Amino acid sequence: MSDKPHELISVIMPAYNEGSCIYENIYETIRVLSDAGYRYEVIVVNDGSTDNTLEEMERAVNEMGCLKIVNCRVNGGKGHAVKTGFRKASGDLVVFLDADLDLHPGQIQNLINILKEKRVDVVTGSKRHPQSQLNYPLFRTFLSNIYAFIIWILFRLPLRDTQTGIKLFKYEVLKKVFPKILCKKYAFDLEILVNAHHLGYKIAEVPIVLHFRRPMNWGRISLVDMSALGVDTLAIFYRMHITHYYDKIAS
């Protein structure tokens, strides 16, 4: 448990067409945080879903409370959804958690423990940590490893994985970094971590347990998405190392 029981934990959960699992993930997140004795708020962001995601969020509010709903009428991407949710956050610590239950919210506790023990500012889950347990398609693992190598070449981050959907930040880190962020979709995580590292914040990785739940090996990542991720990644490099855009934007 946190050594500061008064600390508030904000969990931001962006969701796009997650009607089949969003209620269960909200329930599990609230249960985990309640059992651990934390003060918390859960902020769920409906990112323009076309299924029953919003209705399931509203059902959770009616039955559980401790929940804020943000409804984006148009699908703007994960990055846009998280930034929108952050505007509603008031926690001392902020968790990003994917809504699909591939990563059980019970792992939040480990991220908080590591942040306290190692006295860092950011903790990220890592699929490439040697202690991680993965039930993950081989082709997705292959792509993830290639992307991680490219990131290391371009940015020399002290991380093996930037894209896993569970992360913990001190509030002040995001307050400083978010004004600089331009990516709205999959490279959003990378852009945050690159800027946090550039500003001198300490980052640690933790092993995760991942159970890939989608029926298709590709999941939702299409060739178009991968191409967009590549373009955005190069754009981050360009802004960081060529134009020094991020240094010109006040935090």
Residues of each region from the PLM?
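Acceptor/aglycone-binding surface of glycosyltransferases and processive sugar-polymer synthases
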Residues: C66, V70-K88, L93, P105-Y186, ...
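Acidic donor-diphosphate engagement hotspot in glycosyltransferases and nucleotidyltransferases
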Residues: N25, T53, V82, G106-I108, ...
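Short beta-strand/loop segment that forms part of the nucleotide-sugar
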Residues: Y38-S49, V70-C72
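Hydrophobic helical membrane-anchoring modules
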Residues: M1-I9, L154-R156, K180-S251
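N-proximal low-complexity "stem/linker" segments adjacent to membrane-targeting elements
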Residues: M1-R31, Y38
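Donor nucleotide-sugar binding loop of glycosyltransferases
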Residues: E18-C21, S49, K78, H104
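A conserved acidic beta->alpha catalytic loop
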Residues: N46-E55, L101
